[in-house]
């Protein structure tokens, strides 16, 4: 992944209009160090934005004034699905999405349009806090503070909370709340996390990816999944969804702001892949987005998404592929089908002996044949079989070799075994 990253950072690095804007995700927490080195080499240090705890940037995933509450709530539901891989009952997640949408409406109305995970958590979980905010909303309403649209949102949200949500039986209410707290608790449990991802409005200095696309910035997430298992997945998935939404807006705006190329680089992609990625990868080429992903196997993707059709859509929308040694049968079979079959020459060799009379020799204690003859048969046939068999993927791909399925821009190059140069052994530059 490092050579690809270096080439993209280097590309037109001194040209403000052409240098590439990027989102780089890595849940192991070491990728950002290499990115910093590349940015220093190619004079792009001012373009680098590192999202990390106690860092220089504060990011609130919920502060999207241009997005409807229902869209934000749906993003949160999409992220919840990362932690509900085998959940066959969608009612609880659908209900949690509805509660979040209405809570976001209320929060925007009493908090001057600013929404944080801390506010969402308190307004949903703490009844006294909800009642206190209701008094503020009533006072603003009586003073004609809201326009017609805001008034409608206010009445619909209050109606939902008073007539439906708060009237649910205790068991149903507790289950819905537990679904919501799986996200909100990750942001309010520690002070460092709270001040980084739910800061006051005046402290926000990373507002999203519009600036990344307009000015060619490089956003890197530095958050180790072993230390912050849930939070790193949530932030990674949210950054990815935020980036994808902004990229696709370029098509709607007909590239009026900027037509620079952008890139999405993701190591350990299976940790935060979502079903919406299949649609993005199928359309992002027109939006001039380069997608570079690394995953352990296709089964890893399937384990996260739990939808084989979606996994196949994601795979088929990624044109260039490098396959390394694998023992995963699902991955191998899918690769074999994609590469196809060819006619192979198969030969068989047999030897047979016929005897008219066989007698037993007591002297040698064995059977002796008389008037026997020996015949040998060699046959050759053409059979259709996979170009690369299972043994090739499990045993014949050595370390630092891969099977390449690549395009030259106009056609697919015949798949072939490639020998790769390890980055840590190569002293030159990748360009």
Label for each model-derived stretch:
Residues 284-305:
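Sensor-1/coupling segment of RecA-like P-loop NTPase cores
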